[in-house]
Regions:
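Binding-site signature for planar aromatic cofactors or substrates
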Residues: 1-138
């Protein structure tokens, strides 16, 4: 399977799955395509997912968004910056393979619709995204 990631809109809710005694999946809205085989995500320092990927770096990131994006990216994750912003770590996923879930029988027209209801959280999210974008170029 090819490992080239398509583009997806800013704010797309992705689902990060990590290993452990049982699978663990969480929504992640701060996910940035940083190249054809690289994704950057931001995780709060206290997240169980962060502890899990430190113990076992194998992860899967499901992405569903407008533009008919329906895929799961499989790879290894590592923390590349512990304090991206206060209490948030930057995680790099080196994608080894991409499973495309698209079919001729349907089209993904939109991802999850969501918005911040707290202005402080919204401002922090913008700060996190800007910091991820600064890490994106290699």
């Amino acid at each position: 399977m090819p490992r080239v990631l398509p583009n997806w809109p800013t704010g797309t809710v992705t689902i990060l799955s990590t290993s452990g005694a049982e699978p663990h999946a969480i929504p992640v809205s701060a996910a940035l395509r940083a190249g054809p085989d690289r994704v950057l995500i931001a995780l709060a320092a206290g997240r169980e997912s962060l502890a899990r990927l430190l113990a076992d770096p194998r992860v899967a990131l499901a992405i569903l968004s407008e533009g008919d994006v329906a895929l799961t990216a499989y790879g290894n994750a590592r923390v590349i910056q512990e304090d991206l912003v206060d209490g948030v770590a930057a995680v790099e996923i080196e994608v080894e393979r991409v499973q495309n879930h698209g079919r001729d029988t349907f089209v993904i027209e939109a991802g999850v619709r969501w918005r911040w209801t707290d202005p402080v959280a919204q401002a922090r999210d913008a700060e996190v995204r800007a910091a991820l974008e600064r890490l994106a170029p290699r």
